[in-house]
Regions:
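Bacterial N-terminal signal peptides that target proteins for export
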Residues: 1-9
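Solvent-exposed adhesion/ligand-recognition segments of exported proteins
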Residues: 19-243
Length: 243
């Protein structure tokens, strides 16, 4: 009997653990997003594309400590726009953006509830924009029926979006971008490392040259770092764009 109880507890623990890990990333059905899991590695792909822009829409998006999440840019896309709707995003593991089999691409993560990169969190990208837009704008970008707004997408790419003043972006870990980093939120707290321009950049690699054409005044230009907040910006860490 005692042995049976132990067996039941082991099975329950295994099943409960799997449910918890599965809840880490939850697509909401507005985009054709697929999450493939191999151990503690999560590969996230999408076939929702408009011009040079690919889209993921999630109910929840977290990266647990000890896990690696790879966000893939499909085909010839340059920009990957990720919308998270139902809860704060916590990144405590490794988050990579993959373009043509290596780190690259322009990655946007939009979450009205805030984004936190913990001490063990590392983000490796081509370029990155983190923002906390309001919920109304999120619904404009991709509607409940999956329709994509060209006008709202242009605003995302330009970094010109209405911000939720209660949304906070905090960095205690590391952001490592080959090109640029832009942060727009209600409040920003950096106690980690935000590193950009980690290799020489070529304009043709980072400017959207098809689909929705913009000049990218804020994000993804010249290996710079831009941090903007409706309220306070607190920097107790490192913000550095290598020459």
């Amino acid at each position: 009997m005692f042995r049976k109880i132990i067996t039941y507890l082991t099975i329950y623990s295994f099943m409960f653990s799997n449910v918890c890990w599965a809840a880490m990333i939850t697509p909401d059905g507005r985009t054709q997003t697929t999450v493939n899991v191999n151990g503690h590695v999560y590969d996230v792909t999408t076939s929702t594309v408009s011009g040079k822009n690919a889209f993921n829409s999630f109910s929840n998006f977290d990266v647990y400590k000890g896990t690696t999440v790879n966000l893939y840019l499909p085909g010839s896309t340059l920009n990957l726009i990720n919308l998270v709707r139902d809860g704060k995003t916590n990144i405590d593991g490794i988050l990579n953006s993959i373009k043509n089999g290596k780190i690259g691409g322009n990655v946007f993560i939009l979450n009205p509830h805030g984004i936190a990169i913990g001490k063990s969190g590392v983000v490796n990208v081509g370029s990155l924009m983190l923002s906390t837009p309001n919920k109304e704008f999120m619904d404009q970008v991709i509607g409940q029926d999956g329709s994509i707004s060209e006008l709202a997408t242009k605003s995302v790419l330009a970094g010109d979006l209405p911000i939720n003043p209660a949304g906070v972006i905090s960095v205690k870990g590391k952001i490592k971008a080959l090109d640029s980093v832009a942060v727009r939120a209600g409040g920003v707290v950096n106690a980690g490392e935000i590193l950009a321009n980690l290799k020489p950049t070529q304009a043709s690699d980072i400017v959207n040259t098809g689909g929705l054409d913009i000049d990218a005044p804020l994000a993804f230009k010249d290996g710079k770092i831009g941090v903007f907040a409706e309220n306070d910006v607190v920097n107790a860490g490192t913000i550095k764009a290598d020459a």
